[in-house]
Structures are given as structure tokens and as C-alpha cells.
Amino acid sequence: MSKHPMTVEGAEALKEELHRLKFVDRPRIVEAIATARAHGDLKENAEYHAAREQQSFNEGRIQELEAKLSHAQIIDISKLPNNGKVIFGSTVTICHVATGSELTYKIVGEDEADIKLNKISYSSPIARALIGKELDDAVTVETPGGMVEYEIIQVQYIVE
């Protein structure tokens, strides 16, 4: 399986979630199963079945996170030279040429993307158009509303 890029911050967030699932949620669920089992007949024990379902979800998420972390290529933006190029992990401010509105995005891995936090996946159309470009370059992005032209007005290598 190929490696997937991820920022240091993204990897840390996944590790924190994995730790919580293994050492907080897992013991709590095991205790809930034991408590429900003590109530007697398991066939009609809704608490038991709910706890087992929760356990199944928790274990599945643990496996998913372990797989993501094992296939992650963690990129530390602070160790890369700031040469003004847009790369994975950089924070880019762009200006919509037609309207003059400015947008700022951080280019991150697929699991880290969150448009509410202005984090976009490196595989998104905007990020694909920006990566490799430099300050003052113009890029054209295909959007559902048609082709949109942006100008890169700032490139930062910010570590959160």
C-alpha cells in the first residue's frame, strides 16, 4: 500500500484519538459489557447488545487509525526550506481575480482536511492547482461553477 502524506499535527491528532480509544474507551466498554452480562439473559439484554455494538465500532476505529498511521508519510514543514513555493503543509493566501476576495488555506492530508478550519486536502482541485506554484503566480481552478482564476498573494510555512 502506498504512503499517504500527513502533517505532524495530523499524525499527533490521530495518535491522541488512538490512545483515547485504547486506554479510555476500550476499558469503559469492557466494563459496560461485564455489567450488562451480570443482568442475566443475554438474548433480550439491550444494554449488552448496545455495549457489544459500541465495542465493535471502537475496535474497528482502532484498526482504521493504526492502518492510517502505519501508511502515513509524516511531513514536517518546519524542516523544509521556505523557498516561497506552495508545497504540502504550506499555508497559502489566494485572491479571486474577478472579485478580489481573499481565501487562506493550509494544504494537508486527506484525513486532516476540514474546510471549516481552512484545511484542504492535497488532492482537492484547488490544492492540486496550487502545489508547485510560487508567490504572484496565477492559477486556474475548475470548480462546479466553472473555471476560476486566483493569484497567490502569500505562501507561509506555519507549524501549528
Curated annotation (Swiss-Prot):
The keyword Nucleotidyltransferase does not apply. One of its GO terms (biological process) is regulation of DNA-templated transcription elongation. Pfam families: GreA_GreB (PF01272), GreA_GreB_N (PF03449). Keywords: Coiled coil, DNA-binding, Transcription, Transcription regulation. Residues 50-70 form a coiled coil. GO terms for molecular function: DNA binding; RNA polymerase binding. InterPro entries: GreA/GreB_C_sf, TF_GreA/GreB_CS, Tscrpt_elong_fac_GreA, Tscrpt_elong_fac_GreA/B, Tscrpt_elong_fac_GreA/B_C, Tscrpt_elong_fac_GreA/B_fam, Tscrpt_elong_fac_GreA/B_N, Tscrpt_elong_fac_GreA/B_N_sf. It comes from the Bacteria. PANTHER family: TRANSCRIPTION ELONGATION FACTOR GREA (PTHR30437:SF4). NCBIfam families: greA (TIGR01462), PRK00226.1-2 (NF001261), PRK00226.1-4 (NF001263), PRK00226.1-5 (NF001264). Belongs to the GreA/GreB family. Necessary for efficient RNA polymerase transcription elongation past template-encoded arresting sites. The arresting sites in DNA have the property of trapping a certain fraction of elongating RNA polymerases that pass through, resulting in locked ternary complexes. Cleavage of the nascent transcript by cleavage factors such as GreA or GreB allows the resumption of elongation from the new 3'terminus. GreA releases sequences of 2 to 3 nucleotides. This is Transcription elongation factor GreA.
